[in-house]
From Swiss-Prot:
Protein name (Swiss-Prot/TrEMBL): 3-isopropylmalate dehydratase small subunit
Family: Belongs to the LeuD family. LeuD type 1 subfamily.
Lineage of origin: Bacteria, Bacillati, Bacillota, Bacilli, Bacillales
GO molecular function: 3-isopropylmalate dehydratase activity
SUPFAM superfamilies attached to this UniProt entry: LeuD/IlvD-like
Disulfide feature: none
């Protein structure tokens, strides 16, 4: 996993509450286990009409918001099924940071396991961020737990364990590999059956 230290990007805004994993990536696209190729189906039922034309009223289809890598959204983002495809779709689309009023617990963990930074932020602060010009680069500094725009500076918090994993680009496998010597020593000591 790529280390996450400072991210600069533009933001897309979808301030709906209770966006569930089926809305993030509909079930008909979940027949694969690769982590890539899901971005084109992100928010599929909202982004496209029945003939697969882009819905011009959907925020991610706005020309100013294309290429955004920060998503600012409502409360309880990622609720519903615990499938990991939802974070895969967000990451494959290009999002690195998701700022919400809150997240479903499993979704929150799955974001970090996939190298995305989910940030919990109250509504007042999110509304200030939403007013940022669509073309303005927003800086998210994980090490100092700060989000900076041209007019505001916001602090956020993250559990130390998750922060260290993201800063160092560690997933479960790479963490396990840090204990390779101890594992080999244990296997040498313990009799095989």
């Amino acid at each position: 996993m790529e280390p996450f230290r400072i991210h600069k990007g533009t933001a897309a805004v979808l301030m709906n509450d209770n966006i569930d994993t089926d809305q993030i990536i509909p079930k008909q696209y979940l027949k694969r286990i690769e982590r890539t190729g899901f971005g084109k189906f992100l928010f599929d039922e909202w982004r496209y009409d029945n003939e697969r034309h882009e819905n011009p009223n959907f925020p991610l289809n706005s020309p100013d918001r294309k290429g955004a890598s920060i998503l600012i959204t409502g409360n309880n983002f990622g609720c519903g099924s615990s499938r990991e495809h939802a974070p895969w779709a967000l990451a494959d689309y290009g999002f690195r940071v998701i700022i919400a009023g809150g997240f479903a617990d499993i979704f929150y963990m799955n974001c970090m396991k996939n190298g995305m930074l989910p940030i919990v932020m109250d509504k007042e602060m999110r509304e200030k961020l939403v007013k940022t010009d669509a073309r303005e680069q927003i800086e998210v500094d994980l090490e100092n737990e700060v989000i900076t725009t041209s007019t505001h500076r916001f602090h956020f918090t993250i559990e130390k364990m998750w922060k260290e994993k993201l800063l160092n680009g560690l997933d479960e496998i790479s963490i396990t590999m840090q204990y390779e010597q101890e594992i080999k020593e244990y296997e040498r000591r313990v009799a095989a059956y």
